[in-house]
Amino acid sequence: GVYEVENGITVRELIELAGGIRGGETLKAIAFSGPSGGFTPAILPRGAWPRKIQRLLPANIEQVNILDLQMHINYFRLWDLMLGAGIVVYAQDADLVDQALACLRFYQTESCGKCVPCRIGSTKLAEIGGELAEGRLTRSELEELATETGPITELASTMASTAICGLGTVAPNPLMTLLRFFPEEVRRYARP
């Protein structure tokens, strides 16, 4: 549905306003700003927080439930999260590998093709997502993809700094956040 709310409402309040998670299931992830924001897990462990947040919150807090975050642009910026016109809520039974592949293919299709980084980058991202979803990558290949110096990070950095428009800067987010926050889900797709 469509809901217009004031800044400052919590994620939990918005989801409750919209009727909750279908079937009363448990929250797995949220895509703030749709696929542009990637997938944020329901619970963010301290190690996943931006450094500026780690300095602000007391040391005894080890995790944050994203349902308790206030939906305000400045607050989301502190958390390095995007806050756009919509969110997608995923229950525990959602297959985020499948969802990421759908997002990557969407960006590949939506790329106008004018700039090389986006045209080639979005195609490469969709290819990697397809290889992942089809179980053609080994566990070590998947682990290499997820590193801070791996090919996905390098591609994302190149796209962000050289793409003509915003599409090229956000296209890697679904795959990057999937690899970062949901490694157990990704490993299920690894080739033996």
Residues covered by each model-derived region:
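Redox cofactor-anchoring modules in respiratory/redox and cofactor-processing assemblies
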Residues: 1-192
